[in-house]
């Protein structure tokens, strides 16, 4: 049951976009060898645009070892308030708010209803609503203004790395030189043999705003690797949306221990 919960939590954490104004965004850009870390952070923060709601269809491909599955998910978001996910026919549905993480699975008649502290303990790293929302929007998982960074160039991206890297929890941010959203976010806990890498392979323009189009998540624990690919289609912004969620009666609660 715990492995099943881990799968669902990972999918939530990383889902954690047809619309006439949608088009692909070029990932090419001119790299400036003398740009400072503060300039990069300011440019990245400018991309955190304001919107009321977001809606998208998401194709999710999941692989672990010899096992692979694919899902079609409807994603709805009210910025800073709600992230809502529903698989085809509502077989699996989730609702995430700043205070709660809830989902149910009609395939095995189970549900989970708890706060982020339980999920953080399960994953071995602190997680909150803002982290999940930022991940979906190509923003940094953690506040870049709370640490001092060095800036350098790697391949076709800018790299931000903490000046005082924590050996227990290492993190690197790779920024796209065209629009300064994330190319990749890489977190590792070497002593625990854990690694999480989030790659933003493509972006798209929606109503003059830049949003992720393809996200790839690689999670490694010991020698076990999980890969999740997500493609965001039919994205629309600022429509009136509903977020229906009610745990069916008679379902068994999933307990995290």
Residue ranges of model-derived segments:
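Bacterial N-terminal signal peptides that target proteins for export
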Residues: 1-8
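Hydrophobic, well-structured mid-protein blocks that either form specific transmembrane helices
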Residues: 121-163
């Amino acid at each position: 049951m715990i492995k099943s919960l881990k799968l669902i939590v990972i999918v939530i954490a990383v889902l954690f976009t047809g619309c006439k104004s949608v088009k692909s965004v070029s990932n090419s850009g001119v790299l400036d060898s003398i740009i400072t870390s503060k300039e990069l952070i300011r440019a990245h923060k400018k991309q955190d645009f304001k919107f009321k709601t977001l809606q998208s269809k998401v194709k999710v491909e999941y692989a672990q070892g010899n096992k692979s599955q694919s899902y079609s998910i409807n994603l709805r978001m009210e910025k800073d308030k709600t992230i809502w996910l529903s698989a085809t026919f509502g077989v699996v549905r989730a609702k995430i708010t700043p205070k709660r993480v809830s989902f149910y699975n009609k395939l095995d008649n189970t549900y989970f209803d708890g706060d982020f502290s339980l999920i953080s303990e399960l994953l071995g790293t602190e997680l909150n609503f803002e982290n999940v929302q930022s991940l979906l929007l190509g923003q940094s998982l953690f506040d870049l203004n709370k640490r001092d960074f060095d800036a350098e160039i790697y391949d076709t991206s800018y790299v931000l790395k903490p000046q005082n890297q924590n050996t227990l929890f290492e993190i690197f941010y790779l920024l796209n030189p065209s629009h300064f959203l994330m190319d990749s976010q890489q977190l590792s806990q070497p002593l625990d043999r854990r690694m999480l890498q989030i790659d933003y392979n493509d972006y798209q323009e929606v109503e003059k705003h830049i949003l992720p189009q393809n996200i790839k998540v690689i999670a490694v624990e010991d020698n076990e690797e999980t890969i999740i690919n997500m493609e965001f289609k039919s994205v629309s912004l600022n429509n009136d949306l509903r977020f229906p969620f009610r745990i069916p009666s008679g379902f068994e609660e999933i307990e995290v221990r």
